[in-house]
UniProtKB/Swiss-Prot annotation:
PANTHER family: 50S RIBOSOMAL PROTEIN L4, LARGE RIBOSOMAL SUBUNIT PROTEIN UL4M. It holds the Pfam family Ribosomal_L4. Belongs to the universal ribosomal protein uL4 family. Residues 60-71 have a biased composition (Basic residues). Keywords: Ribonucleoprotein, Ribosomal protein, RNA-binding, rRNA-binding. One of its GO terms (molecular function) is rRNA binding. This is Large ribosomal subunit protein uL4. InterPro entries: Ribosomal_uL4, Ribosomal_uL4-like, Ribosomal_uL4_dom_sf. One of the primary rRNA binding proteins, this protein initially binds near the 5'-end of the 23S rRNA. It is important during the early stages of 50S assembly. It makes multiple contacts with different domains of the 23S rRNA in the assembled 50S subunit and ribosome. Part of the 50S ribosomal subunit.
Length: 207
């Protein structure tokens, strides 16, 4: 079982915590991580692209000239695809790009991301995280005491308004609850700052 240091809000080590081997100690699977990230990014796409076909472009209801006798090629509408300003053939239409990987694959991806954080010493576990008021400076001081000066993902067991709103204005800092932990956020942040309660909650879901 991997062991990591347990810190308090002032940055002092107050003990150690054993992490579940089947959640934080698996061999990171890069292929599964890639699949999970692509799935999440696909779900974020708006999919609102649209072009007009020949039946949707304004005008073109009248035949531009008679069929025979003009010497020109026959035409039925000025909105045919070959005309400038005509409709688009097989153009993009609004669609949803979202899809879901199997649950086992999604879980393995999260386990791989969490394990890579442990492996790369990018995991910081707190005994607790509480702020008396909504103050950005207070949150900044907590992170500074933990030597977190880059992009970090802050995770607590349940929603904490003071922590969430205090972290909101800090560049590169994202707040999540334990049940919202996902591969994309884990990988795009350099550090994972997580409370002991949140670790237990994540292990309970993924173990």
């Amino acid at each position: 079982m991997p062991k990591v240091s347990l810190f308090n809000q002032t940055g002092s080590q107050v003990g150690e915590i054993e992490l579940a081997d089947n959640v934080f100690g698996v061999e990171p699977n890069e292929s599964v991580l890639h699949d999970a990230v692509v799935m999440q990014q696909a779900s974020l796409r708006q999919g609102t692209h649209k072009t007009k076909g020949r039946s949707e472009v304004r005008g073109g209801g009248r035949k531009p000239w008679r069929q025979k006798g003009t010497g020109r090629a026959r035409q039925g509408s000025i909105r045919s695809p070959q005309w400038v300003g005509g409709g688009v053939v097989f153009g993009p239409t609004p669609r949803s790009y979202s899809y879901k990987l199997p649950k086992k694959v999604r879980r393995l991806a999260i386990k791989s991301a969490l394990s890579s954080k442990v492996k790369d010493s990018e995991l910081v576990v707190l005994d607790d995280l509480k702020l008396e008021a909504i103050k950005t400076k207070a949150m900044k001081d907590v992170l500074a005491s933990l030597s977190v000066d880059s992009k970090a993902l802050v995770v607590t067991a349940d929603y904490n308004e003071n922590v969430a709103l205090s972290a909101r204005n800090l560049p590169g800092i994202t707040f999540l609850t334990a049940d919202g932990v996902n591969v994309l956020d884990l990988l795009k942040h350099d550090k994972l700052v997580i409370t002991k309660d949140a670790v237990e909650k994540v292990e309970e879901v993924l173990a």
